[in-house]
Amino acid sequence: MRFTEHEMTAALTGAAKTVLAARRRDVRRVRVDIDTVWEQMDRHARFVLLDGLGDQILPVLVALPDVEVAPGTRPSYSDRSVAEVVEALAGEELGRLRRAVMVRARTALVQSALAALPPRTDPDALTGPDRLE
C-alpha cells in the first residue's frame, strides 16, 4: 500500500501512544491523558520508542496490498490479511509458538497503527483558504 509520509508518521505515532498507554499504569487507570504523557516525554525517549516500533510496523504497512480508499475514509484491512503479511515478513528463526505470538502481537500493533491513520483527502479537490492575502 502506498502511504504518504504524513500518514506513516501518524500511524507510527498512534501505535507508539498505544504501546506507551499499555506500559504506564497512570494512563491505564485514566489518571493522566496519553497525549499529556506523550508531550511530557523528552525527544530522545520518543525517538527510542518510535525507532523500536518502526522496524516492526513500517515494513508491514508498505507490504500491505493496495486497496481503494474513498476520500474521507481510512484504509482498513482484516486481521487475517494483516497477519498474512506479517507471517510473510517474519523470519524462520523463531519456533512455532513464538512465531504465533509474534504474529498476533504485531498484527494488533499494525491494526492500532491503521486506526491512527488520518482520513484520506480527495486529491482532485481544491482545498485551501477562501482568499489568498
Residue ranges, per PLM feature:
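Alpha-helical propensity feature that highlights long, continuous alpha-helices across diverse contexts
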Residues: M1-E133
